[in-house]
Amino acid sequence: MKSVAVVVFAVFLALVPPALAQVPDSATFGRKNTFGIFVDYSNDSSHIILGSAEGRKFTEIGFQYERRLIVTHNLVWKYTAEFRPLIAESDLTYIETTVQTSPPPAQTFVSQPVAIPQCRPASASYSFINPDTGIVQAGTITISCGRRWTYAEGLSPLGTRINFLPRKRWQPTGSILAGFLLSSKKIPVDTGGSFNFMFQVGAGVEYFRTPTQSMRLEYLLQHFSNAYTAPTNYGVDSGLFKFTYTFGR
């Protein structure tokens, strides 16, 4: 345990500049133009805002640009835009397996996976007499749930961010972003669309290692849906954890 504590303390010293006193208290952290790279992840989805598709996973890697618009003693207001070249979205799939035991010989039929809003595993037996042949038909039907991943890209050109306490290294921050994503398959269901609108709102904390470099950790509520540009519009609500590294000039 002692060695682990030493390693953690060493990493902390590497991340936090030792010469904190070199930055005057009156200085404002950050620059007019800021660039960043981020990664985020959500392990599940549920009905939070408008979405009804459950069990979706979502992760992305992207790039961020921010331009400072207003600076006061208490806050900084910025324009924000993000480009996401790599998005992976995972949907639940439904698979039906029918094992017919009568009449012999036994036969098995497996359906193709179908992406649906929710999936619950189930199994049931059936038995009936075919009125045309008088033969007993019996067997079992099993519903199993799977998962498929879909590649997508996204762009959020409409966004804003507010940082509070701009003269402090630790700054509370909040953001709103709006844009769209394009996917290689229809999401989140097979009757959905490959084009979806996306909205994010969240808050977190930003730590400035130097006046021009920072690390930001946020929790975001995200919604995407096709606004009925496709036959169905289930939508997905997710809670994402997002880490961003930024540098300014």
Question: PLM features: what roles do these ranges have?
Answer:
Residues 37-39, 61-67, 156-162, 176-180, ...:
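Residues on the lipid-exposed face of transmembrane beta-strands in outer-membrane beta-barrel proteins
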Residues 38-44, 82-86, 177-181, 220-222, ...:
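Outer-membrane beta-barrel pore domains and translocons
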Residues 20-69, 236-249:
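Short glycine/proline- and aromatic-enriched beta-strand/turn motifs that initiate or cap beta-hairpins
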Residues 48-56, 88-152, 183-194, 230-234:
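Extracellular/periplasm-exposed beta-strand and loop segments of Gram-negative cell-envelope proteins
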Residues 21-32, 69-79, 165-172, 209-214, ...:
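Short loop/turn motifs that connect adjacent beta-strands in outer-membrane beta-barrel proteins
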Residues 23-31, 204-249:
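Predominantly the C-terminal beta-signal and adjacent terminal strand-loop region
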Residues 31-33, 55-61, 149-156, 170, ...:
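Residues that define the transmembrane beta-barrel architecture of outer-membrane proteins
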Residues 31-37, 75-83, 172-178, 197-199, ...:
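Transmembrane beta-strands of outer-membrane beta-barrel proteins
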